[in-house]
Amino acid sequence: IKTGMLATVAIIERVADELAAHSTGVPLVVDPVMISKSGYELLDPDAVATLRTRLLPQATVITPNLHEAGHLLKSTVRTEADMRDAARALHDMGPEAVLVKGGHLAATDDAVDILFDGTTFHAVRAPRIDTPHTHGTGCTYASAIAAHLAHGRPLPEAVQHAKAYVTGAIDAALAIGSGHGPTNHFFHCTPFTESVAASADAA
């Protein structure tokens, strides 16, 4: 099971109640979507508090980015050392594991994420890809983790597979329109033989 943006206290409470009643033993990936790419806060403070107390403790793993981790902790996460501290503090809120995503780290050659299971830290690295077309990367990453957990893979292995998948999807991202284009979820299935722009011109 994977959750994404849950906008209100009522929605979070209903999801938490249903999960508690029906999902015993099923891995739960919580992607705590709460801040837009432009920095706009999508959840009010009461909803964030409910997310902390009702949903995080049920999670197999939570997958905040730097901004979301900072928002949950009411702090700032800027460095890899900060990510490790944040992962430990978030783990204290009850999830089995925490994956702090470092895609927004400044001036790094690789994209590093920190996975913490309460005992061991794992640094999950991939080459940083210079592209503006990263719309949906966090959702894709969390969903891929959930898919690999559903296949029975241990969490560290599931995260490694998901990281490789989302990196490939970013590398093959689609330049659609004039804004941030989406990742290409099907890059490994049906390679495009011509550019999206050329296809659009032909149409």
Say what each PLM segment does.
Residues 121-135:
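Short pre-catalytic strand/loop immediately N-terminal to key active-site residues, enriched for Gly-Thr
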Residues 45-121:
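Conserved phosphate/ATP/ADP-binding segment of small-molecule kinases
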Residues 2-3, 29-37, 63-72, 100, ...:
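Short beta-strands and strand-loop turn motifs
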Residues 2-57:
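Glycine/small-residue-rich loop that forms an oxyanion/phosphate-binding "nest" at active or ligand-binding sites
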Residues 75-83, 150-160:
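Short, charged, surface-exposed loops that flank catalytic or proteolytic processing sites
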Residues 10, 14-21, 27, 112-115, ...:
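Nucleotide and nucleotide-moiety/phosphate-recognizing core
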Residues 71, 132-155:
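Short, small-residue alpha-helix embedded
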Residues 156-203:
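Charged C-terminal helix
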